[in-house]
Design a protein with these regions (language model features):
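Fe(II)/2-oxoglutarate oxygenase catalytic core
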Residues: 1-183, 191-235
């Protein structure tokens, strides 16, 4: 697969939130191919697995959001190769974002695990910040990872659906629906609390990764190896 992404030029949606339109090509059929991998993964989730791990719990709901780890769970060459393009494009946009906000570069050291997120109607997300944490089902303590996030990077793969637009709680702006192939970066804290409008049809798909100030403690709590955690360091 040839290079599918371009550097592009950042546009500002609001202070702190920037996006790059047409930053990566979405080949015909790739979303359907990746979605099939997600669906094949879902059917093997048991109730016991869901009770032990929040990721599996989300996976058993029909309409999602399904948070699928593409690094470990993509099995086909097509999906793996395209995901590598997503990673390269994301790192380029992170570098550009840090040029816009030089202090951000001083605060980021690690990346969380990637997520490939899909969901279908009538799903919507209520207002939340990306620093919001929930309790670990196994320990009863709040997961620490979300508290360490500095900004979140989303790659929107499709726009052939109604609804599903971003809305920010504290900014008087209309809902924003990024076009397919758009990368968006937003700060993680409460000032950028956001929701999505209800998804009315179709199946929304995006890649997401959080960029953090400290090592990936959430993965450590869920049993990740030191080698897996160390490789997420930003050098």
């Amino acid at each position: 697969m040839s290079n599918l992404w371009v550097k592009g030029e950042a546009k500002e949606y609001m202070p702190g939130v920037h996006y790059w339109e047409n930053s990566i090509e979405v080949p015909n059929g790739i979303i359907e191919h990746m979605n099939k991998e997600v669906d094949d993964w879902k059917i093997n989730i048991t109730q016991d697995m869901a009770e032990e791990n929040e990721i599996y719990k989300q996976g058993i709901f029909h309409n999602g959001p399904i948070r699928f780890n593409p690094e470990f769970n993509f099995k086909t060459e097509e999906s793996i190769t395209y995901f590598k393009q997503i990673v390269l494009n994301t790192m380029d946009k992170v570098a550009q974002y840090c040029e816009l906000y030089p202090d951000a570069k001083l605060e980021i050291n690690w990346m969380e695990p990637w997520q490939y997120i899909t969901y279908t109607p009538p799903k919507n997300m209520t207002y939340h910040s990306d620093n919001h944490s929930v309790r670990n089902q196994q320990t009863g303590k709040h997961d620490l990872g979300p508290y360490l996030r500095r900004f979140t990077v989303l790659t929107y793969l499709n726009d052939d659906y109604k609804g599903g637009a971003l809305k920010y709680r504290y900014f008087d702006l209309p809902p924003f629906k990024p076009k397919a192939g758009t990368v968006l970066i937003q700060p993680s804290n409460y000032m950028w609390s956001h929701a999505t409008t209800p998804l009315l049809n179709g199946r929304k798909a995006a890649f997401l990764v959080a960029v953090s100030s400290h090592y990936d403690v959430s993965s450590e709590e869920y049993g990740a190896t030191p080698e897996d955690i160390i490789r997420r360091e930003l050098r």
